[in-house]
Curated annotation (Swiss-Prot):
Any coiled-coil regions, as ranges: 26-80
Residues modified to Phosphoserine: S41
Compositionally biased residues, Basic residues: 343-355
Position of sequence motif Nuclear export signal: 47-62
Protein name in the entry: Nucleosome assembly protein 1;3
Highest taxon of the lineage: Eukaryota
Cysteine methyl ester, modified sites: C371
Lipid attachment points (S-farnesyl cysteine): C371
Free-text note on domains in this protein's UniProt record: The acidic domain is probably involved in the interaction with histones.
Organism: Arabidopsis thaliana
GO annotation, cellular component aspect: cytoplasm; nucleus; plastid
Further comment: Triple mutant nap1;1-nap1;2-nap1;3 has no obvious visible phenotype but exhibits hypersensitivity to DNA damage after UV-radiation, affected transcription of NER related genes, slight hypersensitive response to abscisic acid (ABA) in seedling growth and impaired somatic homologous recombination.
Gene: NAP1;3
């Protein structure tokens, strides 16, 4: 489909996202699909009767496939729910160990020798467990600043749960009491139009109740007054800054149509995709395999996968390079033959009395074959 009306482009997404009402968004998508379906019916009408009948049978086969796929998704959802319940006791045990609520049996001898050390005696559980796990993931580490680390050491646990109405999932970040904000629970909910595709409707985060002067998503700039100014005080200015805690204030689409253009719509779409990527990474990678991210084992696993992909790419590139080199050699040979023949047919220079040879217009800037490598 090459026509503008046939493509579901950024402007279509923008017009859909402008409606905060979920039903309105779904209807906008349905209308678009109905329009496309109408265009497909036009295609069928242009087919010969025999071919049209064959396509109709193919559509019947597709319908049966879709019924099986629907059943698969239902059973998969039930299976995921079943195993999520089986995971939960393990997550509870992990929480107790990480936060020092329970002690593991069989402590190593060298740890017992350090019991007299005051610092070791004070440390319970696994300090900075979640901070380290998050920092070891490339997607999440890009969001964490040095200032954020002071607050993230108070992170006790991360959980997630499904949301049934509207469909989606919610992340829960449990914090110990800390000097940065009053909240002990920060949440981030993703509302989806379709979980299987997935199509994100919107994201909602907790408003953080910062203590005075402790906000990590803003920085205060002080500007010195001009020299000679009487009773002048430093000018203070507050600016937004990069922080992991911006995650709880997701990008919002303006209500007014006039407040957004196509360029801004594309920017918002990219921000929403990035935001969803962070949330899904925490849900699918960090929470289930937290200790592997803490130790760094998960990094090695991902690097191994990336290296395999790179090796395949390198092999393909080498093959392509060899082919290109062969083609270049053949082209060079052809060029040399052409240039030699041109030299024989036409003089490369024209002599004028009392002057140097001058290059003709049709050969100006050409080099003889032996100069190509210079």
């Amino acid at each position: 489909m090459s026509n503008d009306k046939d493509s579901f482009n950024v402007s279509d997404l923008t017009s859909a996202l402008k409606d905060e009402d979920r039903a309105g968004l779904v209807n906008a998508l349905k209308n678009k699909l109905q329009n496309l379906a109408g265009q497909h019916s036009d295609v069928l009408e242009n087919l010969t009767p025999k071919i049209r009948r064959r396509v109709e049978v193919l559509r019947e086969i597709q319908g049966k496939h879709d019924e099986i796929e629907t059943k698969f998704r239902e059973e998969r959802a039930a299976l995921e729910a079943k195993y999520q319940k089986l995971y939960q006791p393990l997550y509870n045990k992990r929480y107790e160990i990480v936060n020092g609520a329970t002690e593991v049996e069989g402590a190593p001898e060298d740890a017992k020798m350090d019991q007299g050390d005051e610092k070791t005696a004070e440390e319970k559980g696994v300090p900075s467990f979640w901070l380290t796990a998050l920092k070891n993931n490339d997607v999440i580490s890009e969001e964490i600043t040095e200032r954020d680390e002071g607050a993230l050491i108070y992170l006790k646990d991360i959980k997630w749960c499904k949301i049934e109405e509207p469909k989606g999932f919610k992340l829960e970040f449990f914090f110990d009491q800390n000097p940065y904000f009053k909240n002990t629970l920060l949440t981030k909910a993703y509302h989806m139009i379709d979980e299987d595709e997935p199509l994100l409707e919107k994201a909602i985060g907790t408003e953080i109740d910062w203590y005075p002067g402790k906000c990590l998503t803003q920085k205060i700039l002080k500007k010195k007054p001009k020299k000679g100014a009487k009773n002048a005080k430093p000018i203070t200015k507050t600016e937004d800054c990069e922080s992991f805690f911006n995650f709880f204030n997701p990008p919002q689409v303006p209500d007014d149509d006039e407040d957004i253009d196509e360029e801004r719509a594309e920017e918002l779409q990219n921000l929403m995709e990035q935001d969803y990527d962070i949330g899904s990474t925490i849900r699918e990678k960090i929470i289930p395999h937290a200790v592997s991210w803490f130790t760094g084992e998960a990094i090695e696993g991902e690097e191994f996968e990336i290296d395999n992909d790179d090796e395949d790419d390198i092999d393909e590139d080498e093959d392509e390079d060899e082919e290109d080199e062969d083609e270049d050699e053949e082209e060079d040979d052809e060029d040399e033959e052409e240039e030699v023949s041109k030299t024989k047919k036409k003089p490369s220079v024209l002599h004028k009395k009392g002057g140097r040879p001058q290059v003709t217009d049709d050969q100006q800037g050409e080099r003889p074959p032996e100069c190509k490598q210079q």
